[in-house]
Amino acid sequence: MAEHEFHKINLLIITPYEDFYEGMVDSVRIPTSDGEFGFMAGHSPFVAALEPGACVLTTGGETKYCMLSEGYCEINGMLALIVCNSAEWPEDIRLRRIINAYKAAIEEIKTHQDKNGRPVFSEDSVAKGKRALARMRFIERYGTDQQRERLADYKKSDFPDGKIPRLQ
């Protein structure tokens, strides 16, 4: 048993609201500002900035997926600490909230203009839009069939031609 545990890394995912996940895992894949990054037990020390996206946890042949928002990850041998603003399992994501957040971000971007009438991109508005878009992509990839169908329905009813407008 001890030898088996040696090949696992202790993963902690912490948000301001809860200790989202704690457990021994075989491997983890996270969304970083430099792209997707994977690690296992014994990885050299590492710190990375997180981007909104999917976190993939693998242990004992089972794979779990969760959605992470902005934050950071620190790896130190047998411990990986992820601190982020929010973390959600697919079944906990509210689809209507995602669509509304994306629409609000687009509206904020459209209404903020410089003196020449050109859009001024507020970092907060762009970040809000990116989080919503990352959640939509997460559901399209890892959500249940019902969630994917509902998301497609929301996109059709809320966006022309069912296409999501670009942020910028």
Where are these regions (language model features)?
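A positional/architectural concept
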Residues: M1-Y65
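Short alpha-helix boundary/capping segments
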Residues: G42, G60-T63, S86-R97
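Compositionally biased, intrinsically disordered low-complexity regions
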Residues: F37-M40, C73, I164
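Acidic/glycine-rich phosphate/pyrophosphate-binding loops and surrounding catalytic core
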Residues: W89-Q168
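A short local loop/turn or secondary-structure capping micro-motif enriched for an aromatic residue
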Residues: I30, V47, E74-I75, P90-D92
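Helix-adjacent hinge/juxtasegments
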Residues: V56-G77, I82-C84
